[in-house]
C-alpha cells in the first residue's frame, strides 16, 4: 500500500511549465527588440566599437586617438554637430508623464501644450508669426519679434502686459516692456516715497487715523487709494447734481385742495 501511494504521489507531482515568453532564452534573444524611436541605439560606431559617437565621447578621447582611426578634425566636428542636433530634437516630456516610452503624437501634444502655456503667460495674443518651431524647454526667450513690434508701435497698449505700475509713467512702462531693466541713472526713490506718503496720508484722513494703513503693503495701499479716488468722484458728482427737494405733506395738501377749488370754479 505504501509503495503504491508513493508511486501515485510521484506521478502527481510535476514542475509547472513556463510559457515561452518567460523563458531566459526568449528574453535574451528579444532584448534588442524593445527599442523605440526615442530610445533607439546609435548605429554609428568608432572602429567596430560598441560605444556611440556623442559629444561626451569625443571630448573624452584625445586627438591622438581620433587621428589613429583615420578621422580628420572636420569630420569630428561634423559628427559632434550631428550628435547635438539629435539631442535637441528629443523633447523632454518627463515633467508631464512618468512613462519611459510614448507615441510621437502624445509627445507633440505635450510640446504644443507647453508652447500654448508660454503664449498665455508672456503674450496676450500669441506669437505674431504663429511659429511652431519654438521650444520652451530649451530657450526661455522666444525671440525678438514681439519686442520689435512693441518698439515699432509704442502707442499700442493692446500688446503691453504692464498697463499701470505705481510710480511709473508711460515711458517707464515702455522701457519695461522692451526689457530695458538696467538704466544708467538711479531710480527716483524720493519720488516713489512721496507718492506712497501721499496715498498713506489720504487713506488715514479718510479712515479717521485708523491703524489699518500701517498693516497694508504698498501695492494694497495703491489699490485702496484708487478705490478711494473713485468713491470721492462719485460723491462729488452726487453733491453737484441738481436734486429736487422732497415735497412735504402740508404742500401736498395745499396743492390738492387748490386743485379742487379751481375745479369747482
Curated annotation (Swiss-Prot):
Pfam family, one: ANAPC9
Subunit structure: The APC/C is composed of at least 13 subunits that stay tightly associated throughout the cell cycle: APC1, APC2, APC4, APC5, APC9, APC11, CDC16, CDC23, CDC26, CDC27, DOC1, MND2 and SWM1.
UniProt pathway: Protein modification; protein ubiquitination
Keywords in alphabetical order: Cell cycle, Cell division, Cytoplasm, Mitosis, Nucleus, Ubl conjugation pathway
Predominant localisation class: cytoplasm
InterPro entries, sorted: APC9
Superkingdom per UniProt: Eukaryota
Name this polypeptide is given: Anaphase-promoting complex subunit 9
Subcellular location: Cytoplasm; Nucleus
Amino acid at each position: 500500500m505504501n509503495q503504491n501511494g508513493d508511486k501515485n504521489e510521484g506521478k502527481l507531482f510535476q514542475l509547472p511549465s513556463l510559457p515561452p515568453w518567460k523563458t531566459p532564452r526568449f528574453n535574451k534573444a528579444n532584448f534588442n527588440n524593445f527599442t523605440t524611436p526615442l530610445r533607439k541605439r546609435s548605429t554609428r560606431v568608432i572602429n567596430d566599437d560598441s560605444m556611440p559617437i556623442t559629444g561626451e565621447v569625443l571630448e573624452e578621447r584625445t586627438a591622438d586617438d581620433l587621428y589613429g582611426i583615420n578621422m580628420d578634425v572636420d569630420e569630428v566636428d561634423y559628427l559632434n554637430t550631428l550628435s547635438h542636433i539629435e539631442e535637441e530634437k528629443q523633447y523632454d516630456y518627463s515633467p508631464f508623464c512618468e512613462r519611459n516610452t510614448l507615441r510621437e503624437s502624445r509627445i507633440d501634444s505635450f510640446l504644443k501644450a507647453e508652447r500654448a502655456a508660454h503664449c498665455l503667460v508672456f503674450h496676450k495674443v500669441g506669437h505674431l508669426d504663429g511659429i511652431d518651431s519654438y521650444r520652451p524647454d530649451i530657450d526661455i526667450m522666444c525671440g525678438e519679434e514681439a519686442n520689435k513690434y512693441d518698439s515699432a508701435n509704442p502707442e499700442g497698449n493692446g500688446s503691453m502686459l504692464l498697463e499701470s505700475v505705481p510710480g511709473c509713467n508711460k515711458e517707464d512702462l515702455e522701457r519695461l516692456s522692451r526689457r530695458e531693466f538696467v538704466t544708467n541713472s538711479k531710480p527716483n526713490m524720493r519720488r516713489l516715497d512721496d507718492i506712497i506718503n501721499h496715498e498713506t496720508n489720504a487713506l488715514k484722513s479718510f479712515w479717521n487715523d485708523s491703524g489699518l494703513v500701517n498693516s497694508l503693503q504698498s501695492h494694497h495701499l495703491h489699490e485702496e487709494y484708487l478705490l478711494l479716488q473713485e468713491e470721492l468722484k462719485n460723491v462729488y458728482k452726487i453733491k453737484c447734481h441738481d436734486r429736487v427737494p422732497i415735497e412735504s405733506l402740508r404742500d401736498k395738501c395745499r396743492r390738492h385742495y387748490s386743485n379742487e377749488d379751481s375745479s369747482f370754479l
